[in-house]
């Protein structure tokens, strides 16, 4: 008779850094927030989709707020107190995510906007007609 397999959930490690980097990628359809150590290894992440939203609601400021709150709680749990914020993209969740990180008790050292700007790169999609 086969024995039942037991599954073990992965425990989050407490990282020995007190400073982290929060990357916020905010598009019109979603907001993805990643917490990394200064070398770039991802410690925690969340998005509008992982917080339970589907479709166009993933791109709302409220979805970004919930995602930022989850990442901030993980950061505090790991012992991270100070963060740098790098923001990419034109979406609606940029400001809300930064405010939520501050409200959760993280000290923001600096905010950098790293939105990629093309030097006349790809041709944009044709204009939408409704």
Swiss-Prot record:
Sorted alphabetically, which Gene3D superfamilies does this protein's record hold?
Answer: Ribosomal protein S11
UniProt lists the family membership as follows:
Belongs to the universal ribosomal protein uS11 family.
Q: Which HAMAP family match?
A: Ribosomal_uS11 (MF_01310)
Subunit structure of this chain's protein? Part of the 30S ribosomal subunit. Interacts with proteins S7 and S18. Binds to IF-3.
Name the source's superkingdom.
Answer: Bacteria
Q: What does this chain do?
A: Located on the platform of the 30S subunit, it bridges several disparate RNA helices of the 16S rRNA. Forms part of the Shine-Dalgarno cleft in the 70S ribosome.
Would you tell me the protein name for this molecule? Answer: Small ribosomal subunit protein uS11
SUPFAM superfamilies listed in its UniProt record: Translational machinery components
User: GO: which molecular function terms?
Assistant: rRNA binding; structural constituent of ribosome
Biological process (GO) annotations held by this record are:
translation
Q: Which InterPro entries match?
A: Ribosomal_uS11 (IPR001971), Ribosomal_uS11_bac-type (IPR019981), Ribosomal_uS11_CS (IPR018102), Ribosomal_uS11_sf (IPR036967)
Q: Does the keyword Ribosomal protein apply?
A: yes
A Pfam family matched in the record: Ribosomal_S11
Instruction: Report one GO cellular component.
Output: ribonucleoprotein complex
Q: Which UniProt keywords apply?
A: Ribonucleoprotein, Ribosomal protein, RNA-binding, rRNA-binding
């Amino acid at each position: 008779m086969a024995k039942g397999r037991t599954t073990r959930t992965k425990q989050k490690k407490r990282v020995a850094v007190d400073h982290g980097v929060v990357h916020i990628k905010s598009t019109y359809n979603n907001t993805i927030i990643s917490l990394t150590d200064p070398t770039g290894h991802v410690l925690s992440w969340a998005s509008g989709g992982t917080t339970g939203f589907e479709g166009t609601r993933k791109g709302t400021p409220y979805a970004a707020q919930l995602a930022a709150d989850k990442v901030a709680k993980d950061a505090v749990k790991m012992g991270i107190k100070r963060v740098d914020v790098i923001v990419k993209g034109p979406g609606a969740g940029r400001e809300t995510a930064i405010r939520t990180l501050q409200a959760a008790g993280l000290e923001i050292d600096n905010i950098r906007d790293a939105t990629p700007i093309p030097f006349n790169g790809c041709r944009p999609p044709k204009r939408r007609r409704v």
